[in-house]
Amino acid sequence: MGFRVMPMFGTNSANRNAPDYARFADAATAKIDGDRLDLNWVDWDNDRHQEGWLSYMNLGVDSWREWLGGRITDAIQRYGVDAYFLDIAGGWVNNPRADMHEGIRRLVGDLRRAYPRVLCCGEMHYDALLAFIPLYQAFSQWPVRDHVQRYARFFQHLSHPAPGRGSSGVHESGFNHWDAQTLSLRAGIIPTLNV
């Protein structure tokens, strides 16, 4: 059956305490009123509380897009990965510093030109992303499924329960109910085994 390798990259999250944060700090997002926008709803260390050190980054700003693109390029070249996963790819904020949508489009386009056989996958989506990201996790638009699935495919979210105890691994949701009858699958979604 085989397997494919797809590392995850934080599309719009950066640790303000990281040693090289200053290289791309200008890409930290502010709300339209100027207040700092933190990506503080994610729990990375499984303590059931947000972290407090994540800046919400803007891919429209060259410094962040180039830094993230370099990290993805390094993983592709060093490990020969089959795909790369852009966590929270559908995140968008009306940030006057730069156009977030244009930034993600440029990142994906640059990587596709350099590595045409490496698949881009995103989490979350909005209609304009369907033009250049063909695969997503976390499908939730059931009323318009037939329309959306003409342009992209979807697989189960990272929080999809693993067989047995229903663990979601390191994801902040902890455990979910595993249904042995249906394998916790939904119609139209690529079957996904999370371990």
Role assignments for model-derived ranges:
Residues 1-7, 100-103, 108:
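Aromatic-lined substrate-binding rim segments of carbohydrate-active enzymes
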Residues 1-3, 80-82, 116-118, 189:
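Short, well-ordered coil/turn segments that N-cap beta-strands
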Residues 14-54, 58-62, 66, 70, ...:
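Glycan-recognition surfaces
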Residues 2, 76-77, 184:
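Acidic (Asp/Glu)-rich catalytic clusters
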Residues 17-22, 93-101:
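Short, flexible/disordered intra-domain loops and linkers
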Residues 9-15, 86-92, 124-127:
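Short, solvent-exposed turn/loop segments enriched in Gly/Ser/Thr/Pro and often Arg
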Residues 5-8, 84-86, 120-122, 191-193:
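Hydrophobic faces of well-ordered beta-strands that scaffold small-molecule active sites
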Residues 58, 67-97:
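Active-site groove signature of glycoside hydrolases
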